[in-house]
């Protein structure tokens, strides 16, 4: 009887482990973006936050010489990036990320305000999961 019980438990555990591993693998995706003055940045993806940030910096440098220093990143593929650029006290851009447009905009406004920037304007939104502008 105990051997039969062990076999049943093993038979039930294997599919659960496979299901759990599949879910974890699906969540190992990070999106990152480094904004620039030309608004020509693209969203990039990687399996780690650090790798995504590094790739975003490289992608920005391929198309611009005005890349921001700090990438924005998220592992929420349903999140949104908001990109703003400011002109006072000097030209600078930043990106914020949030669960929706208003949260992302709130985040980037906070970052720029805390850094002392003013005369800022929203450049664009990007969908984290697809990279689509809008």
List the predicted regions and their residue ranges.
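Secreted/extracellular ectodomain signature
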Residues: 24-134
């Amino acid at each position: 009887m105990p051997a039969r019980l062990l076999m049943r438990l093993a038979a039930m555990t294997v599919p659960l482990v496979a299901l759990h591993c599949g879910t974890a693998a699906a969540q190992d995706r990070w999106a990152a973006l480094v904004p620039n003055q030309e608004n020509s940045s693209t969203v990039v993806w990687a399996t780690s936050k650090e790798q995504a940030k590094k790739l975003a910096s490289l992608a920005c440098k391929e198309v611009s010489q005005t890349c921001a220093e700090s990438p924005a990143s998220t592992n929420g593929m349903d999140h949104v990036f908001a990109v703003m650029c400011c002109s006072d006290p000097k030209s600078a851009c930043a990106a914020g990320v949030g669960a929706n447009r208003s949260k992302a905009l709130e985040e980037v406004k906070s970052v720029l305000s805390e850094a002392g920037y003013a005369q800022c304007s929203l450049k664009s939104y990007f969908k984290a999961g697809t990279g689509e502008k809008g």
